[in-house]
Amino acid sequence: GPGMLSKNYDGLQNDLDKMDGVFLKRGQYTYPLDKGSVWHFVPLVSVGDKVEASAWLGQVDENFQPLKIMVPFTQKGVCTVKSIVPEGDYKIEDVVAVLVDEEGNTVEVNMIQKWPVKRAMTNYKEKPRPFKLLETGVRVIDTVNPIVEGGTGFIPGPFGTGKTVLQHAISKQAEADIVIIAACGERANEVVEIFTEFPELVDPHTGRKLMERTIIIANTSNMPVAAREASVYTAMTIAEYYRAMGLKVLLMADSTSRWAQALREMSNRMEELPGPDAFPMDLSSIISNFYGRAGYVKLNNGESGSITFIGTVSPAGGNLKEPVTENTKKVARCFYALEQDRADKKRYPAVNPIDSYSKYIEYPEFEAYIAEHINDEWIGKVNEIKTRLQRGKEIAEQINILGDDGVPVEYHVIFWKSELIDFVILQQDAFDEIDAVTPMERQEAILNMVIDICHTEFEFDNFNEVMDYFKKMINICKQMNYSKFKSEQYEGFQKQLEELVAERSVK
């Protein structure tokens, strides 16, 4: 019901702010909603209207979000509205509407919804393939491997590769109405970090605190196993509740490996047959059913809502071949591989551009959307930079073996062009005010600029010249990324860049 935004829950939806002490006491439960709060209710239906489960009866405002009060999700068949209260202030347990079902029984409706967390809500008309780009402001995601509204993605990576910073950046900048964070089985200090940092973050879309539209579900690794298993389901169910209101929800789970470990412990205790690595035999179907609950839906009243799900996977020892990563890879459509090597070189975000992928780029619906909203050459250019990065990596290996003199100068040029793509497009400073968020218009300008340089032919006598020249170029481009888009400073750097390119290009 209303009153969940900016709350901190545990995996069983106990309100953590109402509890005291370091550990939860056995058998201690708290009610997740505030029974004393008063909400201003505005009716959306009138007496005699026909309604079904999850139809909107009225709306209340919470933290500037219009939340809908709906017919109970468990209601079967078509009901008729017998009475509805006038606009006014009510508590969550007050009856706001009385319905008559097909058998003539009266159903009293208040603002509270109850639903079992492990069952998916299917109260929508259809679930089309998602197609609308979800802007995150992170170039390595938006430009190279885009995720869509209602899409699924996962981020595997060993410790210290920046999973949490990347998640913070996405949750802060992505175009979502509600953000839900499920900290499932993380170390206690990381959960405390979320509790202390999130209230400080300012929402760039509204200028108010990000916490106003966030729900945190925290389960540290020393909480009971059953709660850890339930926490991810609880988060998904809350997300489905908001999706039924026609809102865009972003759900972040950190980390799904700990959730899978909880599944493993439960199944081992129940003496089920163990599968690979002692995980349950049906791990793949559990994971795919769970990911299948996310998505973009058309509701019965013609509105649309979406759940975009991004889960992190922290495989033991960074081994990407273990069952959780393998099974997640089958169902998630976007894969952002964070790697230790890039993190050690301080190339953040440390997403490996060659191993990572987004299957949405191949969707005809997505191509049509991009052609309409950006331009029709966009996807071709994105594929070109991926090819150039791959080629650059191959040449880097050759240079490593044969030495700088052992390969032709043209090879050095190809390698440095791929480095230019890496430094200018892939790398981004999450702590710089301007560089942290790159709008699509600016990403398009950066991509076009880099592609134009890559298409230019240059003349050099030896490999030292290539290196010095491209380092100068990368430096100017970096300064452009740090300056405000189309400001005087930006234009100045652009002029410098044009002069530098003209200096060496083949006439």
List where the protein language model places each region.
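Short, conserved beta-turn/loop elements at beta-strand boundaries and strand-helix junctions
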Residues: 12-16, 62-65, 86-89
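PDZ-domain C-terminal substructure recognizer with occasional recognition of PDZ-binding tails
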Residues: 81-86, 93-96
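P-loop NTPase catalytic core
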Residues: 143-144, 150-472, 486
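Short coil-to-beta-strand transition motifs
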Residues: 1-5, 71-78
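C-terminal amphipathic alpha-helical interaction region
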Residues: 461-507
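N-terminal accessory targeting/assembly segments
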Residues: 1-25
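Conserved hydrophobic positions within beta-strands
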Residues: 8, 56, 79-81
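P-loop NTPase nucleotide-binding/switch module
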Residues: 19-41, 46-55, 59-62, 68-74, ...
